């Protein structure tokens, strides 16, 4: 694989602290810079142009840009008043009833001079981790200060937010980012940071990130700090996950019903110290994205991997279980041939 060294620079980041974590250094500033979830982002663009912000809930998996999107929207709406008119709180750290009564209520009461049609914004991250009592108190504050303050919530599961709050908000949903979206962003970062990389190295980072941009940038920076060169071997060492090439080899051999050849690869991963969950998760991810297996066979593979994962999560996570999984996959392939 050819190693690429990039030399391009980006004027937007040249004045930033070089020691700043890349996940913060490359956090979007404008709504148009947000990666992925185009439909939801376009709705945020419309809100920023219209200027009338409702209370909103953005739900979705970690690392998909929920909080960054809210911050971009707040900047677009408030401009120079951003610092004094925005209050950001991570509800997973400060989620008690006292925090709602003291910090949030005091900011909601605070008088800030804003242009007509603009409101103060309270941003609560991971609000789904707040206690029910704190959420009830929050609902009351939303009612009392609705004329001056808007609330923007980010969460992983909107179902954990009480119904009275949900009914007062517009709910927007984010999904995991696609591999191509993450790859595009990674290429931009390695160009700016002048990081030497190989294509298989970026592919390994995408594989370990599983649609999480924050995880992808953290893994990229950690690999660069530890080894300099971004290649598959170095990424695997840093992320401590089963090597994708070994997993692909296991799946390919099982697709050929070749248990005898597949088992040594599995045994090597086990001897290297990887847990059953590590190996099963890697098998699932690689199988799901494989284009070398017929669709029906892929579905049967995923079903057997899912059953094995169920047993592993209930405590039956031995090498025997993984060996049994290989035999099941090989049996599926034999049935397909017949």
UniProtKB/Swiss-Prot annotation:
Disulfide bonds: none annotated. GO terms for molecular function: ATP binding; ATP hydrolysis activity; DNA binding; DNA clamp loader activity. ATP binds at residues 60-67. SUPFAM superfamilies: P-loop containing nucleoside triphosphate hydrolases (SSF52540), post-AAA+ oligomerization domain-like (SSF48019). This is Probable replication factor C subunit 2. GO terms for biological process: DNA repair; DNA-templated DNA replication; leading strand elongation. It is found in: Nucleus. GO terms for cellular component: DNA replication factor C complex; Elg1 RFC-like complex; nucleus. It comes from the Eukaryota. Signal peptide: none annotated. Keywords: ATP-binding, DNA replication, Nucleotide-binding, Nucleus. The elongation of primed DNA templates by DNA polymerase delta and epsilon requires the action of the accessory proteins PCNA and activator 1. InterPro entries: AAA+_ATPase, ATPase_AAA_core, DNA_pol3_clamp-load_cplx_C, DNA_Rep/Repair_Clamp_Loader, P-loop_NTPase, Rep_factorC_C, RFC_lid.
């Amino acid at each position: 694989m050819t190693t690429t060294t990039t030399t391009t620079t980006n004027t937007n980041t040249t004045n930033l602290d070089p020691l700043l974590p890349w996940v913060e250094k490359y956090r979007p500033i404008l709504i148009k810079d947000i990666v992925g979830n185009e439909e939801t982002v376009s709705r945020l663009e419309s809100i920023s142009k219209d200027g009338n912000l409702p209370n909103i809930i953005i739900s979705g998996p970690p690392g998909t840009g929920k909080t960054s999107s809210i911050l971009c929207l707040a900047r677009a709406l408030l401009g120079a008043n951003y610092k004094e008119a925005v209050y950001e709180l991570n509800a997973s750290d400060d989620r008690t009833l006292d925090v709602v009564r003291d910090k949030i209520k005091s900011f909601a009461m605070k008088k800030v001079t804003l242009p007509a049609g603009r409101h103060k914004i309270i941003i609560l991250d991971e609000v789904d981790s707040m206690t029910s009592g704190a959420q009830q108190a929050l609902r009351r504050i939303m009612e009392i200060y609705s004329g001056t303050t808007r609330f923007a919530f980010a969460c992983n599961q909107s179902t954990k937010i009480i119904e009275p709050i949900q009914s007062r908000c517009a709910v927007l949903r984010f999904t995991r980012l696609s591999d191509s979206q993450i790859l595009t962003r990674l290429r931009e970062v390695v160009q700016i940071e002048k990081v030497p990389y190989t294509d298989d190295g970026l592919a390994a980072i995408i594989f370990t990130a599983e649609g999480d941009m924050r995880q992808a940038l953290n893994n990229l920076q950690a690999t660069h700090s530890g080894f300099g060169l971004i290649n598959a071997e170095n990424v695997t060492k840093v992320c401590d996950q089963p090597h994708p090439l070994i997993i692909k080899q296991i799946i390919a051999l099982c697709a050929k019903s070749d248990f005898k050849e597949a088992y040594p690869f599995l045994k090597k991963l086990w001897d290297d110290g990887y847990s059953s969950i590590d190996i099963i998760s890697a098998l699932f991810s690689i199988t799901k994205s494989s284009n070398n297996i017929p669709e029906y066979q892929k579905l049967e593979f995923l079903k057997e991997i899912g059953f094995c994962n169920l047993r592993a999560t209930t405590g039956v996570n031995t090498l025997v279980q993984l060996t049994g999984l290989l035999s099941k996959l090989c049996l599926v392939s034999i049935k397909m041939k017949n």
